[in-house]
Swiss-Prot record:
The gene is Slc2a1. This is Solute carrier family 2, facilitated glucose transporter member 1. Detected in osteoblastic cells (at protein level). Detected in brain, and at lower levels in kidney, heart and lung. It comes from the Eukaryota. The lineage of its organism: Eukaryota, Metazoa, Chordata, Craniata, Vertebrata. Gene3D superfamilies: MFS general substrate transporter like domains. The keyword Glycosyltransferase does not apply. It is found in: Cell membrane; Photoreceptor inner segment. The chain crosses the membrane at residues 12-33, 67-87, 91-112, 121-144, 156-176, 186-206, 272-293, 307-328, 335-355, 366-388, 402-422, 430-450. The modification Phosphoserine is found at S226, S465, S490. Residues 34-66, 113-120, 177-185, 294-306, 356-365, 423-429 are extracellular.
Length: 492
């Protein structure tokens, strides 16, 4: 390992910091819609009354509100599937810069929806910011992974998830009645997204383009070398360049990789399966059910001030993402993901017991709070941050954009399904709804144990070569890598 490989330079932190402002936008827009639900529904009612001279029917109101929440995920699906169209043509940094136009348009639509007496403006704004966030969930992990040195790739990749959870926490705090979650200021609450967009537009021109993109996609070796020297803080970047050139040579031997090719080619089939299942393990773990309906869950658990308990879970969320940031390069991705899944399954069982016995034993409300906080904490240890950046690690430069698009689409689709279905399933199953998530978590644990490789400390080309060859040479492996390094199938 080069001495500079663990060096954190100012230019590297500027690049990563500028990029993860997009992650913060994703988190903010995920969490912002929940707190002001009642005042926005009242706005819908007033608008309907203004147009038609009568109160809005309750079924129409429910439909409009569900659309306002769910349209964000629909936009995210479209955006995530379009990642490859932008990053290969315009580059990673320029794609992030261009997409801020969507954030500005969305801010204007949502900010002026009350003035324009138009709930259509709000819904369209939610759709557009959803497209922006879908693109961001592809751009940011890809860019951060490509500018980071191998030894710091996991830690810096976790900053994407940290940006998301900080965004959720800011949305929860800003959404309090006493701040912006009231009848007068909710348009500002939804449109404040123009601030991080503006800040990103100021910072990104000073950030370098991905050196991998410059060398492998554009064949601009001198520019790539110059960028690497600034990012690494050293004049000797020979090893980085050699690794990228080897990846480039491998890419030239491969034909252009389409999304269909990812599923057809034996070399890509296993990594794309891993990428998709890890994304599903994040969204189908039940975490979004907890965040979407945390206030109502705390109310059922008998908490007097549920909104503050929800903010408490947001603080736990942020704190344990920071913990993951410091341990991901020591413990490894696979290990943390397994710990997170197992811990969440245990907390889901506790939550079920607490909610089921709440009427007979009022003190169970305290157990439910502990279970929810534990559920959130274990999520941020592994299933929260790791699926985002491990997708970029599993693929070389050629198939990476297509793989990120497929994985992102899987994430957003499962997010949409949970958001739409949880309320109905919860009404059907009552306190036993989290048993469903427990079963899913156990299945994801089994899959991760047998199929997911450890990517810690390995270059992109080494990881991709492992899948191509069905396993690296035994002499190159650490004891940890010897144990299911590329899944059971690869060890035949």
């Amino acid at each position: 390992m080069e001495p500079s490989s663990k060096k954190v330079t100012g230019r590297l932190m500027l690049a990563v910091g500028g990029a993860v402002l997009g992650s913060l936008q994703f988190g903010y827009n995920t969490g912002v819609i929940n707190a002001p639900q009642k005042v926005i529904e009242e706005f819908y009612n007033q608008t309907w009354n203004h147009r038609y001279g009568e109160s809005i029917p309750s079924t129409t109101l429910t439909t409009l509100w569900s659309l306002s929440v769910a349209i964000f995920s629909v936009g995210g699906m479209i955006g995530s599937f379009s990642v490859g169209l932008f990053v290969n043509r315009f580059g990673r940094r320029n794609s992030m810069l261009m997409m801020n136009l969507l954030a500005f348009v969305s801010a204007v639509l949502m900010g002026f929806s009350k003035l324009g007496k138009s709930f259509e403006m709000l819904i369209l704004g939610r759709f557009i910011i959803g497209v922006y966030c879908g693109l961001t969930t592809g751009f940011v992990p890809m860019y951060v992974g490509e500018v980071s040195p191998t030894a710091l790739r996991g830690a810096l990749g976790t900053l994407h998830q940290l940006g998301i959870v900080v965004g959720i926490l800011i949305a929860q705090v800003f959404g309090l009645d006493s701040i912006m979650g009231n009848a007068d200021l909710w348009p500002l609450l939804l449109s404040v997204i123009f601030i991080p967009a503006l800040l990103q537009c100021i910072l990104l021109p000073f950030c370098p383009e991905s050196p991998r993109f410059l060398l492998i996609n554009r064949n601009e070796e001198n520019r790539a070398k110059s960028v690497l020297k600034k990012l690494r803080g050293t004049a000797d970047v020979t090893r980085d360049l050699q690794e990228m050139k080897e990846e480039g040579r491998q890419m030239m031997r491969e034909k252009k990789v389409t999304i269909l090719e990812l599923f057809r080619s034996p070399a890509y089939r296993q990594p794309i399966l891993i990428a998709v299942v890890l994304q599903l393990s994040q969204q189908l773990s039940g975490i979004n059910a907890v965040f979407y309906y945390s206030t109502s869950i705390f109310e059922k658990a008998g908490v007097q001030q549920p909104v503050y308990a929800t903010i408490g879970s947001g603080i736990v969320n942020t704190a344990f993402t920071v913990v993951s940031l410091f341990v991901v390069e020591r413990a490894g991705r696979r290990t943390l993901h397994l710990i997170g899944l197992a811990g969440m399954a245990g907390c889901a069982v506790l939550m079920t017991i607490a909610l089921a016995l709440l009427e007979q034993l009022p003190w169970m409300s305290y157990l439910s709070i502990v279970a929810i906080f534990g559920f959130v904490a274990f999520f941020e240890v592994g299933p929260g941050p790791i699926p985002w950046f491990i997708v970029a690690e599993l693929f070389s430069q050629g198939p990476r954009p297509a793989a990120v698009a497929v994985a992102g689409f899987s994430n957003w689709t499962s997010n949409f399904i949970v958001g739409m279905c949880f309320q109905y399933v919860e009404q059907l199953c009552g306190p036993y709804v989290f048993i469903i998530f427990t079963v899913l978590l156990v299945l994801f644990f089994i899959f991760t144990y047998f199929k997911v490789p450890e990517t810690k400390g390995r270059t992109f080309d080494e990881i991709a070569s492992g899948f191509r060859q069905g396993g690296a040479s035994q002499s190159d492996k650490t004891p940890e890598e010897l144990f299911h390094p590329l899944g059971a199938d690869s060890q035949v």
